[in-house]
């Protein structure tokens, strides 16, 4: 995943979270905001795993996003991983992220 697609700064994360548009899944919370271009930030809480494992999970998510190629979406997004995500295998993780990206690309705002 190219650097231009990645959000890193705290104020960038806060701006998107303050928009209060979100999808909540058992394994992932996705905050999003309409934008001119696609950008994504990935957050994994410190209490879930040591730094090596958190970085490994971030690399996995970036790899999955590279396979899906959602770069034509005009959204800024924050993916926050939940504890259940750690127990999934790679294929299940891939399906979860695909499901989320499809939801946002179809424009389904309400999720219950």
Curated annotation (Swiss-Prot):
Tell me which EC number(s) this protein carries.
3.1.26.5
- InterPro entries per the UniProt record, alphabetical: Ribosomal_Su5_D2-typ_SF (IPR020568), Ribsml_uS5_D2-typ_fold_subgr (IPR014721), RNase_P (IPR000100), RNase_P_CS (IPR020539)
Q: Does the keyword RNA-binding apply?
A: yes
State the Pfam families in the record.
Answer: Ribonuclease_P
Q: Mind telling me which GO cellular component terms the entry cites?
A: ribonuclease P complex
What processes does the entry annotate via GO biological process terms? Answer: tRNA 5'-leader removal
Q: From which domain of life does this come?
A: Bacteria
- Top EC class per UniProt? hydrolase
| Catalytic activity annotation | Endonucleolytic cleavage of RNA, removing 5'-extranucleotides from tRNA precursor
Q: Name one GO molecular function term.
A: 3'-tRNA processing endoribonuclease activity
Going by the UniProt record, its keywords in alphabetical order are: Endonuclease, Hydrolase, Nuclease, RNA-binding, tRNA processing
The family database entries (Gene3D superfamilies) matched by this protein are listed as: 3.30.230.10
Query: What PROSITE patterns does UniProt report for this protein, alphabetically?
Result: RIBONUCLEASE_P
User: Where are its TM segments located?
Assistant: none
Similarity annotation: Belongs to the RnpA family.
HAMAP family annotated for this entry?
RNase_P
How this chain assembles, per its entry, is: Consists of a catalytic RNA component (M1 or rnpB) and a protein subunit.
Quote the NCBIfam families the UniProt record gives. rnpA
What does the protein in this record do? Answer: RNaseP catalyzes the removal of the 5'-leader sequence from pre-tRNA to produce the mature 5'-terminus. It can also cleave other RNA substrates such as 4.5S RNA. The protein component plays an auxiliary but essential role in vivo by binding to the 5'-leader sequence and broadening the substrate specificity of the ribozyme.
Protein's name according to its UniProt entry? Ribonuclease P protein component
Instruction: Please give the organism.
Output: Mycoplasma mobile (strain ATCC 43663 / 163K / NCTC 11711) (Mesomycoplasma mobile)
Q: Provide the gene name from the record.
A: rnpA
